[in-house]
Swiss-Prot record:
Protein name: Envelope small membrane protein
Organism expressing this protein natively: Porcine reproductive and respiratory syndrome virus (strain Lelystad) (PRRSV)
Chain intervals for the UniProt region annotation (Endoplasmic reticulum retention signal): 2-15
Family listed: Belongs to the arteriviridae E protein family.
A molecular function GO annotation: channel activity
Lipidation (N-myristoyl glycine): 2
Length: 70
């Protein structure tokens, strides 16, 4: 009977261990997903800053031509 109880207790320990491993795996996956999301936001922000700076520098160069058109 002792062997049966030890097998049952070992089964519960293994199941709980697998549960903890799956929780940690999900947390790691969500952290990676959040990291990619933040990296995407940063990339879009930098792209908008660069494009805005380029457009502002071009409009400053061609401002006399633009004033003739306007």
């Amino acid at each position: 009977m002792g062997s049966l109880w030890s097998k049952i207790s070992q089964l519960f320990v293994d199941a709980f261990t697998e549960f903890l491993v799956s929780v940690v795996d999900i947390a790691i996956f969500l952290a990676i997903l959040f990291g990619f999301t933040v990296a995407g936001w940063l990339l879009v922000f930098l792209l908008r800053v660069v494009c805005s700076a380029l457009l502002r520098s071009r409009s400053a160069i061609h401002s006399p031509e633009l004033s003739k058109v306007l």
